Amino acid sequence: MFRWSAADRSVIVFVLTSTFRAAASSAPRNIAAAQPACNSWDEQIHFRDAYKIASGRNVAWTEAELDIVNRVNIKCNTKEENELLRNYMDKRNAEIVMKEKKETVLISYDKLAYIPMAVFLFIGKCLKLPFSALFAFGKLGNLLMYIFVMFWAIRLAKSRKILLAFIAMLPTPLFLASSYTYDSVVFSFITLGCVLWARETFFGGNRYHTPSVLMAIFLFTVGCLSKAVYIPLVLLMLLLPQFYKKSKKEKLLVFIGMGMLFFVVMATFVLPIISNTVSGNLSYGGDSRGGDTSAVRQLISMIKHPWSSVKLMVGGVFQLDNFRNLGRAEADNYFFGNLMFLNFASHGTLADKWSILLLPMMTLLVFQKEEGSERIAKFHIFGKVYAWLIFIVTIMLIWLAMYLSFTPVGEQQIAGVQTRYYLPVIYLGALLLSNSKIKVEIKEYSLAKLSFIVANILQIAAVWELLLQGRLI
């Protein structure tokens, strides 16, 4: 299973090296430019949860840490100002101003994605790093986890290898990986899970490779614990060809097992809303940041107006112009591809002109003719329909979750949906688009070099225009 092919040696080593080179050159600059302030999406919440895990049962907060938790950002426009901010925050880290005691040291299932960041925060605290260094060091745990998991996703992929490497090197995925967030864990784990599933489904032998199957189920599950909306993806395992060669009893056991796993994880998302609806707790499930939001009242509204709700959901998904990226009207003026791949959150998004590089490169990689691609294109019609159904249901659940929790009750548009939520299903979507009619024939090595060049141009442009220009020079 883990043996390099001849084609891999000439192409994939180069691609993987490119991924590490991009991560090594750009991600630390993203970390450094963000010190010590919140710049990514809800970074104050993610830092708080990671810091609590790192602190054990007794959590001690300093003024600097509470500034981050409360997102008290001080804007810096020069190197000198940034240095002053670091010194200021380091001084505010000298005295403990608040303590809290957690009920247990056990980590909640939906907080497992914070472990890489928490481990590095714990190490940094043991080393007594100044706060600015500690804040950056915690992000390093997230980055290393991302590189490790994506390395194996690219390494093990039998199809669309270069596409995976290209996406892994783009500005937004690397920016997320060098921030406090669970998004990079969700993205990388689900992507690797899809890779292992695709190996067994399209390129497997007559028997399961049991470690791959178990690992895929594990990765899907862990990747979905922080965002349960992706859990339908675990049902892809029922498409494994070997499943249909089992006895009726074995099929039933596998079916029940997958079904139970699906419903247990979905229950973490659905049951609290249903139980609070039944009990009449109308305030449950609102956005903690404010606004007239309530998952319970929104669900009641949907039940009262089912057709309008379905029409709103379907319209929102297919219009592609309703991504509320930063909560500002001007954030919707960007091409959704730029919002997904060329976006540095509060730092801004690269202008639409850069999609002239992004779109053609993505098209080449998605429709690249490669060895074994015909196996995917000729997959039986039931399997394709089933996989597309899972893909669509997952997308709909993303929008439903945002409609319930982040959209004011009765609003005629869905707020809170961001294009980065689509990242975990990008690889699956690329596989499903494989067909026997649209093919791009180009040498793999040439395509790998081209993708590396384009990814680095976009990365350099993002770092220059969004982080450095007019600020730190």
Q: Which residue stretches match the model-derived regions?
A:
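Short acidic/glycine- and proline-prone juxtamembrane loop motifs at membrane-interface regions
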Residues: 179-186
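Membrane-lumen/periplasm interface segments of multi-pass, membrane-embedded glycan/lipid transferases
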Residues: 94, 273-370, 473
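Perimembrane helix-loop-helix junctions
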Residues: 198-205, 231-263
